[in-house]
Amino acid sequence: MTEEHVVLLDEQDKPSGTLEKYAAHTLNTPLHLAFSCWLFNEDGQLLVTRRSLSKKAWPGVWTNSVCGHPQQGEAIEEAIIRRCRFELGVEITDLTPIYPHFSYRAIDPNGIVENEVCPVFAARATSVLQVNNEEVMDCQWSVLEDVLRGISATPWAFSPWMVMQASDDNARELLSEFANGN
């Protein structure tokens, strides 16, 4: 894969430039655009993934199915499809906004800062997973309610963005409806 960049955002969340992805994620990360996707199978189970130990931020933690950054000029939906293929080797359908105005700032144990405007989507997997082990060290299809209980009981085991997304009542309701095929 070619060198990835992040789209930097100004105070009004408008694109203001780009920066190489690894240069952007530091102790002083500028605000940038990202996305999160919660991927479900035909049985309504959620794919939770464990971030590779080689990840710069939050290595080894469990998180939602796929996250990433759109490239300059790339629609978020196109970026989600690209990252699902790259990280999980999977095709998706029914891409649906769940929490379009989610944003957060979090600091990982190594001091790396995430500072993102990060729309959240749900989608359905339409093919068998072929996981890229450089991105994902483990994954599991789980019942959404079980995952939400796990997040509540042990939030430290999950990415902060997943915990924050799961704590939003409206997002939880929309994810549950999506899982149930509504």
From Swiss-Prot:
Domain Nudix hydrolase, chain residue ranges per copy: 30-164
Residues involved in Mn(2+) binding: H25, H32, H69, E114, E116
Broad enzyme group: isomerase
Highest taxon above the source species: Bacteria
EC number: 5.3.3.2
UniProt-listed InterPro entries: Idi_bact, IsopentenylPP_isomerase_typ1, NUDIX_hydrolase-like_dom_sf, NUDIX_hydrolase_dom
An annotated Gene Ontology molecular function: metal ion binding
Amino acids binding Mg(2+): E87
Location of the protein in the cell: Cytoplasm
Cofactor remark from the record: Binds 1 Mg(2+) ion per subunit. The magnesium ion binds only when substrate is bound.
Catalytic residue list: C67, E116
Pfam families: NUDIX
Keywords annotated in UniProt: Cytoplasm, Isomerase, Isoprene biosynthesis, Magnesium, Manganese, Metal-binding
A biological process term (GO) from this entry: isoprenoid biosynthetic process
HAMAP family according to UniProt: Idi
Assembly information from the UniProt record: Homodimer.
Classification via NCBIfam families: IPP_isom_1, PRK03759.1
Family: Belongs to the IPP isomerase type 1 family.
UniProt-recorded name of the protein: Isopentenyl-diphosphate Delta-isomerase
Lineage of origin: Bacteria, Pseudomonadati, Pseudomonadota, Gammaproteobacteria, Enterobacterales
Gene name linked to the record: idi
